[in-house]
Amino acid sequence: MRILGIDPGSRKCGYAIISHASNKLSLITAGFINITTTRLQEQILDLIEALDCLLDRYEVNEVAIEDIFFAYNPKSVIKLAQFRGALSLKILERIGNFSEYTPLQVKKALTGNGKAAKEQVAFMVKRLLNITSEIKPLDISDAIAVAITHAQRLKLH
């Protein structure tokens, strides 16, 4: 089974695809979609086109998205919600469903502590997947963590 984990952002959208087979997790690919255009419509289109390419290329079975966190800037939250809405619609069209996890759920699943720092989550991602190189930016390790969290939830059900 292939799981796509997404950490949506207003400038960078982290993604990771992991394989979950025979109780073993392995990283297939990870990166981020850089959102560089200035018009919102173009940003959404760029994001959706990149998602389409990932879904086509890697034959994803499951998708998990990190939920919106609390932010002090209402404009950022609204923009992020628009991106998530567009991502959600495309995923529903292509896959049929998706799961959502809060940052607290992801941190707790990987570290046992819902208030863990991003660096602790990145450390556990590397440890669980036997990754020796540095994972930068942290949007990528967050996306991997979302995918791992979903794989753990699937094992429980």
UniProtKB/Swiss-Prot annotation:
PANTHER family, per the entry: CROSSOVER JUNCTION ENDODEOXYRIBONUCLEASE RUVC
Protein name as it appears in the record: Crossover junction endodeoxyribonuclease RuvC
Organism: Helicobacter pylori (strain G27)
CDD domains in alphabetical order: RuvC
GO-annotated biological processes: DNA recombination; DNA repair
EC number: 3.1.21.10
Essential cofactor(s): Mg(2+)
Key words, A-Z: Cytoplasm, DNA damage, DNA recombination, DNA repair, DNA-binding, Endonuclease, Hydrolase, Magnesium, Metal-binding, Nuclease, Virulence
InterPro entries, sorted: RNaseH-like_sf, RNaseH_sf, X-over_junc_endoDNase_Mg_BS, X-over_junc_endoDNase_RuvC
Active site: 7, 66, 139
Cofactor binding summary note: Binds 2 Mg(2+) ion per subunit.
